[in-house]
Design a protein with these regions (language model features):
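Short aromatic-glycine motifs in intrinsically disordered, low-complexity regions
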Residues: 63-67
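Short, conserved catalytic or interaction motifs in soluble domains
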Residues: 62, 82
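Short amphipathic beta-strand starts and helix->beta connectors
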Residues: 83-88
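Short, loop-centered acidic/histidine patches that primarily coordinate divalent metals
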Residues: 74, 80, 107
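Conserved hydrophobic positions within beta-strands
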Residues: 14, 60, 74-77
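Acidic, low-complexity mobile loops and tails
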Residues: 1-56, 89, 93-126
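Histidine- and aromatic-rich ligand-binding microenvironments
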Residues: 68-72
């Protein structure tokens, strides 16, 4: 079973959101990176870009496919992980840590997102 930390919330598209001191850090889940396989390219929005919950904010390309990354929250991107763009395999190696993707201004509604237990059940249902 893929790792599912309790300190963040999750989408049905397999993204995570973690509040961090006035911002929401976003990434893809361990399950997502496992399904994608070896990630070879990451495209992220520049700081200042407005993102909308449920809409694509970037993409990841693996040796298997190209997949959109959907924003779990609405707001303005305040930071992107340049390391994930220049070293995409970090998303495979550490999806919940060094492989984060963007940070968005806090304040977006997260009520539609699942907690870890609900996400675990969702993944197990397949």
């Amino acid at each position: 079973m893929a790792e599912i930390p309790d300190d963040r919330r999750y989408t049905k598209e397999h993204e995570w959101a973690r509040e961090d001191g006035g911002r929401v850090v976003v990434g893809i889940t361990d399950h997502a990176q496992d399904q994608l396989g070896d990630i070879v390219f990451v495209q992220l929005p520049d700081p200042g870009t407005e993102v909308t919950a449920g809409q694509p904010l970037g993409e990841v390309e693996s040796t298997k496919s190209v997949s959109d990354v959907y924003s779990p929250v609405s707001g303005k991107v305040i930071e992107k992980n340049a390391e994930a763009e220049s070293n995409p395999q970090i998303v495979n190696e550490d999806p919940y840590g060094q492989g984060w993707l963007v940070a968005v201004e806090a304040g977006g509604d997260q009520s539609e997102l699942m907690d870890a237990a609900a996400y675990k059940a969702f993944v197990e249902e397949g």
